[in-house]
A protein has these predicted regions:
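C-terminal long alpha-helix characteristic of the crotonase
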Residues: 1-5, 86-91, 142-190, 203, ...
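A structural preference for short, pocket-lining loop segments at secondary-structure junctions
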Residues: 1-37, 55-65, 84, 88-92, ...
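Short, active-site-adjacent cap segments at secondary-structure transitions
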Residues: 22-26, 71-73, 177
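A short acidic, glycine-rich active-site loop
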Residues: 36-47
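CoA-thioester-processing core
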Residues: 52-58, 66, 72-126, 139, ...
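Well-ordered beta-strand positions
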Residues: 84, 123, 127-129, 135, ...
Length: 218
């Protein structure tokens, strides 16, 4: 519900997600609950989790995951739903679901391979291993690794840098990238043209271009 409200709030330019305290970014799924449900009930549970991650992924504002601790299972899937991931040097990430008898169910099998590639995704999912922040950065799972003490400051700094740009330009870029990710090149280029055109109908584009031209003439 919060993200649905944010999606309609034009005053919010960037969203930062982080966990409370220093221990975990997100605890992920409720394993005790999962141990008691039927196969049919598990489908609904997985669909609910996928709806949550899809809602985060599709919100119009750019999203930054400030991964402050453990991001395992559903927590890692939530982080992967964000556009940018900044991890504390103490963070640990992974998809350990196979250790309890199931594959990732909240989008992990699909988003992980799109972020780090199929081979590395298979390794992480099949082994269920937990990796440190530095390795996560090395394979492209997170964008940056920073000291825990400066995590929020660094996330805010990036958010401010994004927010200083054209809101429409950034949001249309997000649409083009997200929709083009699974398309062939020609379709993706068509999506880019649509995003480009949409920005040309917005007054902010004219104001920014005029200001740039006037500044260049001085």
């Amino acid at each position: 519900k919060t993200f649905e409200e944010l999606n309609h709030n034009d005053d919010v330019k960037v969203i930062i997600l982080t966990g409370e305290g220093e221990k975990a970014f997100s605890a992920g799924a409720d394993i005790e609950y999962m141990s008691k449900i039927s196969a049919d009930e598990s489908v609904e549970y997985a669909k609910t989790g996928q709806l949550v991650t899809a809602t985060v992924e599709l919100v119009k504002q750019p999203t930054i995951a400030a991964v402050n601790g453990f991001a395992l299972g559903g927590g890692c899937e939530l982080a992967m739903s964000c556009d940018i991931r900044i991890a504390a040097d103490t963070a640990r990430l992974g998809q350990p679901e196979v250790t309890i008898g199931v594959p990732p169910g909240w989008g992990g099998t699909q988003r992980l391979m799109r972020i780090v590639g199929i081979a590395k995704a298979k390794e992480l999912v099949y082994t269920g291993k937990m990796i440190k922040a530095d390795e996560a950065k090395e394979i492209g799972l997170v964008n940056h690794v920073v000291p825990l003490a400066s995590l929020h400051e660094e996330a805010l700094k990036m958010a401010q840098q994004i927010a200083a740009n054209s809101t429409m330009g950034v949001q249309m870029s997000k649409v083009a990238i997200n929709k083009g990710r699974n398309a062939d090149l020609d379709t993706g280029l068509g999506l880019e043209i649509l995003a480009w055109r949409n920005c040309f109908t917005h007054p902010d584009r004219q104001e920014r271009m005029t200001a740039f031209v006037n500044k260049s003439k001085k």
